[in-house]
Amino acid sequence: MITQEEILKHLDVDYSYRLAKRMEVYKSNPVLGYRTAGSRAEFETGEMLKQEMESIGLSDVSKDAVTVDGWEFKKAVLRFEGQDGREREVQLGAYQTTLVTDGFEECSLMYLGKGTDRDYEGKNAAGKLVLVDINQRDEWWINYPVYEAHLKGARALIAVQSGGYGEIGEEALNAQDIAGPEDAPAFSISERDARELKKLLQEKGELSVFLDADTRVRRNCTTYNITGRIPGRHPERMVLLSAHYDSYFSGFQDDNTAVAMMLGIARALVASGFQPNNTIVFCAMAAEEWGVADSNFDWSAGAYEQVFTAHPEWVGRVIADLNFELPALAHGTRARIRSCYEYVDYLNEWLEDLPNLTQAYPEETKVTAPIETWSDDFSMAIAGIPSMVNDFTGGSFMETHYHSQFDNDEFYDEQVNRLHHELFALLIEALDRTAVVPLCFERVMKRAARSLDEELGELWVSPEVAVRLEEMKQLFEQAAEFSWREYEEVREINNRYSSLLSQGREAQAEELFQRERKREAELLRRFKLEQDEFVRIDWYGNVYYLHELCMEKIRLLGGAVKNLREGKISAALRKLYQVDNNAYAFMFSEEVYRHFTEYVLDQPKDRLKWGYQRLAGHENLYPLVTGLLQREFGGESDCRKEADALDEALSRQLRALLDALDTLEKITKKDFIQR
């Protein structure tokens, strides 16, 4: 039996670093990089990774074909005459849209503030390039001003970051998923270059510039997820490791180092002679950054297709997905594993028994939950595969270097990289000594109960609804108690199994393993059921439970009704700003608002991917919001008509809440409480 020390001894972070650097060779844009969904650069990187998997000794190395929308960004250069009279050429970043010029083409450029509907008043943008400021972290995503420009007839929009992302320096370009249609072209420009253009535009109003661009989106392309295996004694039971190999710019941290770490761990396991009980699968995912045109859920396309289309049989067989993102830089003061709730207790217990590992952080490693929609582990989880990821959202990197040309090895932290190698290599070894997937639903039920403690307000919730909420709280608490007792049984089984393996009593261990197949299948079935029925997202991709979203809208709508009946329009508007996607009603035209609402509600599953049926409805408040803004501007305070309209919306949400509780009650009683 291979020991933890043997596995750790064979880890080689220098190998992983070199592999991460090798991935930088493949690029669509010779100046900026980019290795995007369906591009030649992504394909060539996949071919290299396939060869690498074979060379380190993985078995059954294969290319799993998946269909995504493709994007090839070859160039975008802006030429203009500077203030000193000298010709300037600047590199532009790009978003996943289509615009191909015939060499340098002359265009008129105008500056339009933040690119909101109001910024176009009295302006003619038809056929022109529009320069705007944007803060995608604190204000709105790029698709809103881009589509506004498109509707106003602009040839393309050029965005400069005014905060939120790319804060490392004034030369930074930024890239994100566009979440909009491909026929509304968009580019990014550095703060330094935009500042010079703004000075010229202050003098002239409009400026003649020349654009040379080649950026193309093609729908329904084939790309490949690359998989390799270390076969186990139980081929039907798998542990999955995943990381994505597409990137913006050179993508050293996001996500070259993650792919390299995954293969570095694979290489160490093979070299150590580790012979697993479970089959260990290593999957380099394509099309994580973007892969679906004109969709609000346009990222994580490759992972979604891998488990929903290419290998749906993985569900019920894969006991854990260990996903990796940006593992070679320091995120805050400690390493964190971001996990689905069901794995938290197991991970906490496992961390307590770990040997001393590399001291890369001043504080000890912790587990946090739940997983988020930012990475491929969410697609895995909603398919029914329990998942986790090294947490990558702490620290300043996301605001400074993330998705810019400064994502390079200058931020590389060898000690952090080594710690993550050690941590997840040993987690694979620990999971290999389980007979039953160590899931615990207690935290799921405790969160469901805890959210029912929050006050909804006496003015708009009847006594009957209050009684219903208390009944459901007690039911969830009862389910939490049962879930913990069930987990204690699973923990005892796994401890016994691990002990038998350590003693070399493999026959008895195998007998125990086979006896528990039904128990594991049932736990995985219920995990998928819970993901299907409990887990939802709001209009910004944040993870909630179904009833939580209804309750939040009830609080906001009820509060707004109260404010309006008191003549407090500003207070009401602040609440309505938070309802669904109605924040965009304050700044953008109704056609923009309608497009980005309907494309979430009305597109088929293959366009919505992991967001399909994950939202809890929508309240269209556009006419009401714009009307209230006019009343506020005009100094009016009589808003009884608007209050009555919101009362109707409030009633709809109360009905939706009761329906949600009915659904969750049936599932909880049937599947999460001992019968």
Language-model regions, residue ranges each:
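Acidic/histidine-rich catalytic neighborhood of metal-dependent amide-processing enzymes
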Residues: 137-144, 148, 222-225, 247-342
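Noncatalytic luminal/extracellular "stalk/propeptide" segments of secretory-pathway proteins
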Residues: 6, 11-14, 18-21, 25-129
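Soluble metallo-hydrolase cores and metallopeptidase-like ectodomains found primarily
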Residues: 2-4, 89-122, 175-253, 263-275
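Second-shell loop/turn segments in exported
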Residues: 2-11, 30-40, 111, 133-139, ...
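Active-site-adjacent substrate-binding region
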Residues: 318-319, 326-447, 451
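His/Asp/Glu-rich mid-to-C-terminal helical/loop segments that flank catalytic regions of hydrolases
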Residues: 278, 397-450, 574, 585, ...
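Charged, amphipathic alpha-helical linkers/stalks
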Residues: 410-505
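Extracellular/luminal Protease-associated
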Residues: 12, 37, 90-185, 363-366
